[in-house]
Amino acid sequence: MEEQNQYTSPEYEGFKQKLRKIIGLDLNSYKNQIHRRVHMLMDRWGVKTYDDYFNTIKNDDKKLREFLDHLTINVSEFFRNDKQWWKMRDELIPELIRKRGNKRLKLWSAGCATGEEPYSLAILSAVCGLDASTPVLAADIDQGAIAIAQKGIYLKRQLLNVPQEYLAKYFTTRDGGETYEVNAEIKRRVTFKRFNMIDDAFGNGFDIVLCRNVVIYFTTATKSLLYVKFFNALAPGGYFLVGSTEQIFDYKKMGFEMAGPFLYTRK
């Protein structure tokens, strides 16, 4: 069977429908390379049919986690693209505090993966003196990734961008310095939630939303839908940050204004 025919076959359509039913994931929203990753995993496990592969990931948490991991290339670290983070710390958060007249800002890491991004946001929240009673929302479709994030334990190489003063203040060393654990103060500043950004309703009134290196895997139509939802989730004057390889081409049609590289705002 040719590759394209496999992707449009009734068997593959049935696989996608059942997958959406059990984990809320719509593969129709993903680019075509996702299909190749499905076949790569089927080959790895020696599974010949879509029905057999569906039953495999339905009944084996390890294989389901591997499947979710392979939908995207999960490269995550603290303060990734650090210039964005220091702009948030030095300009955006202080500006929002002045505009709002208080330190209760709503912050959201959408597609939080294993937690490096929301914990980075929580550290800046502490550094800037934001009210800890308004935690950072961290949302992801992968419950396995969320479980890892909630533990808050990371390898040294994931912390290369963390300033030494933050490392000393907000982390505890483990295993002779090979791993680090986020301290309790920062953990309390983050609320994790399983979330399907395609199907689930977004909240609103957010001051800063980060969705970096997630939307790039979706089709153009799904991207546009999501960007509109993110715009509506922002409070007036709020900021939306995307990844360093991303650009919203029709941002003006969606209501955004560009506020800097990979940075958009709702006026």
Feature locations, PLM:
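Conserved beta-strand signature within the Rossmann-like core of class I S-adenosyl-L-methionine
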Residues: G237-S244
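A short glycine-rich, Lys/Arg-flanked "PGG" loop and its adjoining helix->strand segment in the class I
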Residues: S224-P236
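Short hydrophobic/aromatic beta-strand or adjacent loop that forms the aromatic wall/cage
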Residues: A259-L263
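Short proline/glycine-enriched turn/loop segments at secondary-structure junctions
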Residues: Y251-G255
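Extended basic-aromatic, gly/pro-enriched interface segments that bind polyanionic ligands
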Residues: T134-L210, V214-T222, Q247-F249, K267
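Residue-level signal for inorganic ion chemistry
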Residues: M88, V209, L234
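Conserved SAM/SAH cofactor-binding pocket of Class I
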Residues: L96-Y166
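Conserved AdoMet
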Residues: M1-L105, Y227, G243
